[in-house]
């Protein structure tokens, strides 16, 4: 273990079991042992900073959120890469043509312009409830780090038509 300097961990399905919805004691002890041996431990997730759970007794050295678009540690922001405003607007329009609501996320807030089962199911993975936001237009004006749309693969191409500053990151 002496050559290892840093370790990265996803949350959903890695640190937190999909069925149990919590971190096991064995996982917590392992993370603490890594830190005790001088190995930096970091979260690497598609989640927003506000939805990263706190794990009692575990202090992470850094957080890579929004699939790496917003990275920070205790001292502040390390990297901040937002989606270009014109791409946010275009993606929202494209989703509307497909009759799909979207959820936009800043580093501090998220909000949706509607509700549908696919998007609600995605939110449930992170123990969140999808609700339409009265602040959607303000949030969509940016800065936006992530846009979530509960769409099947066959809708990826029309959803992303004309988008140059963002790409789909999907696992579910």
Regions found by a protein language model. Name each.
Residues 98-100, 105-172:
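Conserved acidic, metal-coordinating active-site core of Asp-based
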Residues 18-21, 41-42, 80-81, 124-126:
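Short, flexible loop segments at the rims of nucleotide/cofactor-binding pockets, characterized by
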Residues 27-119:
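Active-site phosphate-binding/coordination module
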Residues 1-4, 65:
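Short, small/polar residue-rich loop motifs at catalytic or cofactor-binding pockets
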Residues 3-20, 45:
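Asp-based phosphoryl-transfer active-site loop
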Residues 9-10, 70-73, 138-140:
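Short, basic/glycine-rich phosphate-binding loops at helix/coil junctions
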Residues 23-25:
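A short acidic/small-residue loop/turn micro-motif
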């Amino acid at each position: 273990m002496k050559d290892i300097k840093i370790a990265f961990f996803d949350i959903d399905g890695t640190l937190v079991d999909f069925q149990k919805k919590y971190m096991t004691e064995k996982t917590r002890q392992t993370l603490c042992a890594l830190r005790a041996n001088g190995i930096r431990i970091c979260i690497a997730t598609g989640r927003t900073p506000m939805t990263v759970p706190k794990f009692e007794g575990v202090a992470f050295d850094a957080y890579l959120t929004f699939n790496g678009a917003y990275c920070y540690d205790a001292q502040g922001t390390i990297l901040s890469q937002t989606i270009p405003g014109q791409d946010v607007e275009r993606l929202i329009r494209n989703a509307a043509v497909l009759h799909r609501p979207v959820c936009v996320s800043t580093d501090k807030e998220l909000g949706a312009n509607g509700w549908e089962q696919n998007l609600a199911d995605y939110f449930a993975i992170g123990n969140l409830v999808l609700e339409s936001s009265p602040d959607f237009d303000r949030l969509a004006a940016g800065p936006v780090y992530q846009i979530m749309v509960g769409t099947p693969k066959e809708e990826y191409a029309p959803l992303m038509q004309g988008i140059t500053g963002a790409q789909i990151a999907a696992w579910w």
